[in-house]
Amino acid sequence: MIFVENKEIVLPGSLLTDNNYKLGRGTYKENGKIYSSITGLVYFESEQIKVIPLKDTYSPNYGDLVIGRVTGSSYSSWSIDINSTYHGFLPTTELYDKNEPNINNIINIKDMLLLRVANVDEINRVKLTLRSRGLGKFNQGTIIKVKQPTIHFLSEENAFLTTMIQEYTYTDVIIGKNGLIWINGLKENIERIIEIIELIEKEEPLKHNLIKHIQSMILNPK
C-alpha cells in the first residue's frame, strides 16, 4: 500500500509505503516499510521512491555530478567547496592528467570544477574525482546557485526542458546535483536562461501551467 501522494510534502519518519520499491535518496527501510528520512517532496519514479529536500541543503551520493570551488590544497589533495555541509576533497590520484609535473599548473585556488562524487565515508567526507569524460575546469561561462527542488525539476523530472533551453538559446547548460548550474553562451541568452530559472525558483513547481509558461518563454523571447 502507498500511504502518500506523489509530490506530497512529508516529514522525517513519515510512512511512505510498504510496497517493494527501490530506496532512493531521503528514504530508509524498516521492518519491510519505507519511511522518509528528511522533510521534503515525495517522488515515485518507476520502481523507485525518493524524497527531495525542501531545505537548501545538498546531501552527496555516489556518482552525483557536482560543481565545486577549490578552497585549499595540500601535498596529496585539494579541498573543494561543494555547496554542502559535507567536506569535499579531490585527491591527486583522481586527476584527469596524472603526468602533469606541477599540480598547480592544473588546479588553482578559486578554480571552478565539474566533478563526480566517488565516495562518501562514515564521517561525511566526500571524495571527488575528475577521472571521467567531460569533467574538468571551467574556463568560461556563468555559474548560479539555485534551490534543490529546482535542480530536481530541471535535471530529473523535466530534463527535456533543459535540452530545449540549450537548443533554442544556443547555450551549454550543466546542472550540478549540489545546487549549482553552469551556463555558457551569448550574454543575452544567458540572461534569458537566468530569467527562466528565477521563474522556477519563485513559482510552485507543482503548478500545472509552469511548464507551458517556460516553453512559451523559450520559444517566444521578448
Swiss-Prot record:
Instruction: Specify one Pfam family.
Output: RRP4_S1
Q: Which segments constitute the S1 motif domain?
A: 63-131
Q: Name one GO molecular function term.
A: poly(A) binding
State how it assembles.
Component of the archaeal exosome complex. Forms a trimer of Rrp4 and/or Csl4 subunits. The trimer associates with a hexameric ring-like arrangement composed of 3 Rrp41-Rrp42 heterodimers.
Q: Which domain of life is it from?
A: Archaea
Per UniProt, subcellular location reads as: Cytoplasm
Q: Does the record carry NAD as a key word?
A: no
Organism, as annotated: Methanosphaera stadtmanae (strain ATCC 43021 / DSM 3091 / JCM 11832 / MCB-3)
Name the UniProt key words of this record, in alphabetical order: Cytoplasm, Exosome, RNA-binding
Please give an example of a GO cellular component term from this record.
exosome (RNase complex)
The organism's taxonomy opens as: Archaea, Methanobacteriati, Methanobacteriota, Methanomada group, Methanobacteria
Query: Source gene?
Result: rrp4
HAMAP family per the UniProt record, alphabetical = Exosome_Rrp4
Disulphide bridges, residue numbers: none
Q: Which family does it belong to?
A: Belongs to the RRP4 family.
Q: InterPro entries, alphabetically?
A: Exosome_RNA_bind1/RRP40/RRP4, KH_dom_type_1_sf, NA-bd_OB-fold, Rrp4, RRP4_N, RRP4_S1, S1_domain
Chief subcellular site? cytoplasm
Task: Please identify the protein, giving its name as recorded.
Answer: Exosome complex component Rrp4
Regions that span the bilayer: none
